[in-house]
Each structure stands twice: as structure tokens, then as C-alpha cells.
Design a protein with these regions (language model features):
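Charged, alpha-helix-forming regions
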Residues: 1-255
Length: 255
């Protein structure tokens, strides 16, 4: 059984954006998906390794089965069957309805994907009004110069893509109409109400990280938060500690 990872989630969200806002042919290449995921311009080329990672994710999601309880959506839309209100419903489909195709562009033949249907998770999120939309400039993180101005781009490693995607999802949840109560993004896993909540270390796949890996993840997260504060995406953030141990970041997402 193949798992749906944090990286897959970022790829999936990029595909959904391209389906809804992109070319009406609904044909996407790994390069298009990677650019949408990271905020790169059309003139910037992802590496072969980055493209291969996206292609693996897309191929995997084509064969992952998705079951979604759509009861509330059906009730909200007052959908009936034989004049009777439907009280319970479940969608059973593929996570990504797509077929692999080969297309020729610029004299080169490349692997692409024809997205056959609105990605199911996006469709459901739209139905319950939980679609998250962020600008390309929010995705395109810049390191800040000593004077606070934007400097060079923070390179997109797989770890940084995971950190960025998770932070954005949490921040958008804080900004949403329900305003999530917990403004703290934890670095370590923790238990609440009998459930395990994963911290940034686990989100990046580092269940037992080394000291160097922890330092790098913390620094990357803080660079992103500092950039978003400078550009107005968030209002502020604070480093959370227990003694000398850094445990997370408290984010103020709105004034």
C-alpha cells in the first residue's frame, strides 16, 4: 500500500491549481507542476532529479484509491435520489484521475499527464469552501539581507518544499474563517486528545534527526517565516523554547 506523503500533497495541490487555472487542455508536465509548486518562472528549469521526483509522485497518485465521506456536501446541496434526500454518501475513486501521455514541445518529446477530472481532494475542498490560494511570490522564498530587503532565492530542496507546504497550510488555517486555535508550529511530535500530531522534523521525514538536520530544518523554517513577515503574509512569529531547547514557532497570521 502506497502512502500519501507531505511531498505528494504539495505536488497534488500544484496539479489542482494547474487544472483550475492553467491551460484548458489539462495537460501538465512535471516541469509545469514543479514550477507551480515552488513559484519558479517559465524561464527557470528544474533539475532532472526534481522532475523525476515529481513524476514518481504523479505516477503513484494515479494508482492510489481515495474514499471520501461526502455526506455533508450532499446534504448541503440537497441532492436527492428518487425524490428522497440522500443522508449518507461516499466517493470511491482514484486520488488523481490522469493518463500518462507523450507530447512534443520545442523539438523534444517529454512525458506529460492528461488530467481527466478535477482532482478529487480539490473538488471536495471547493464544495465545503476550504480551498487555499496563495500567490506565486509567497512560494518563491527569498533570504533577507541584513537591511531587511529581499536577497537571493532560498533554493528549493525537497525538505524545504515540505516545510513550506506545511507552514502555508497551517498559516492559511489560522487565517480562515474558523481560525485554528493553535498558532504554534511544533518541531517535535506531540500527543493531544489521544492523537499523535507530527512536528516539522517528522513532516520532513526526519523521525530521528541528527543535530545538524534539526538545525537545518529550524533555520529553513525561520527564513521562510522571516520572509513572509517582511512581505506581509504573516504579521509576526516568535521562537518557542523550553529551557535551551527550541521547540517550535508561534505565528501571528493576522493583525
Amino acid at each position: 500500500r502506497q502512502s500519501f506523503t507531505e511531498y505528494d500533497r504539495n505536488v497534488y495541490n500544484a496539479v489542482a491549481s494547474l487544472y483550475v487555472y492553467g491551460d484548458p487542455s489539462h495537460i501538465v508536465t512535471p516541469a509545469m507542476v514543479y514550477r507551480a509548486m515552488t513559484g519558479l518562472t517559465d524561464a527557470e528549469k528544474p533539475t532532472a532529479g526534481q522532475l523525476a521526483a515529481v513524476a514518481r509522485s504523479l505516477d503513484k497518485m494515479r494508482f492510489i484509491r481515495a474514499r471520501i465521506d461526502c455526506t455533508e456536501e450532499l446534504k448541503m446541496r440537497h441532492i436527492t435520489l428518487n425524490s428522497q434526500q440522500i443522508n449518507n454518501g461516499e466517493i470511491d475513486t482514484s486520488l488523481l484521475m490522469a493518463e500518462a501521455v507523450k507530447v512534443k514541445a520545442g523539438g523534444q518529446t517529454v512525458k506529460a499527464y492528461h488530467i481527466l477530472k478535477v482532482p478529487i481532494l480539490y473538488e471536495y475542498a471547493a464544495a465545503v469552501k476550504q480551498v487555499l490560494t496563495v500567490s506565486a511570490s509567497t512560494l518563491d522564498i527569498k533570504e533577507l539581507n541584513p537591511d531587511g530587503s529581499a536577497g537571493a532565492r532560498l533554493p528549493n530542496t525537497e525538505s524545504r518544499i515540505l516545510i513550506k507546504g506545511y507552514l502555508i497550510r497551517r498559516i492559511e488555517g489560522m487565517k480562515g474563517k474558523n481560525k485554528l486555535n493553535n498558532p504554534v508550529v511544533a518541531l517535535y511530535d506531540y500527543q493531544r486528545d489521544g492523537e499523535t500530531h507530527y512536528g516539522l522534523y517528522s513532516i520532513t521525514g526526519k523521525v530521528d534527526p541528527t543535530r545538524e538536520e534539526m538545525r537545518r530544518i529550524r533555520e529553513d523554517a525561520e527564513k521562510m517565516l522571516a520572509y513572509w513577515k517582511a512581505t506581509g503574509y504573516i504579521t509576526d512569529y516568535e521562537v518557542q523554547t523550553q529551557g535551551k531547547k527550541i521547540t517550535g514557532f508561534k505565528i501571528t497570521a493576522y493583525a
